[in-house]
Amino acid sequence: MTARYQSTKVFQGFSTAFRQWRAEGTHCAYLHGYDVFFKVWFEGEPDHRNWVWDFGGMSRCQGTIDGMSPRAWMDHLLDHTVLAAEDDPELDMLRELDRRGVLQLRVLPAVGAEALARHLQERLDAFVAAETAGRVRVVRVEFFENERNSAIYEP
């Protein structure tokens, strides 16, 4: 059996609001916010320092996500933002509020803890694989709405 090395990192400090329009009949259909955070699992062979992933690597990396450093990308996506699905029937109104400076809108294919776990895993995995020439992969992301509710995505 081949040994597998994993390390984890928690990213926190994001105040994020959601609109889950498909959650009809529940209070989650309304705009609501959380102090969200997420945990990332890195897997790969240790480097010359015996590290799978540099715990400060998101700050010291060379690559970018959408033209931003990884931490700036995380802040852009999650810090003091409103997340809405691309098929939200009120998207035009939310875009107008964004245009007026009332909110910072981020439009994603889907929203919710499960959708965010997947989105983060896919984007971070592509970044980390490129940054490490394929030596390390992001194999799991757990997204927390709060300390009691989370969703995990593993491809």
Residue positions per predicted region:
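Charge-rich, low-complexity N-terminal segments
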Residues: M1-P155
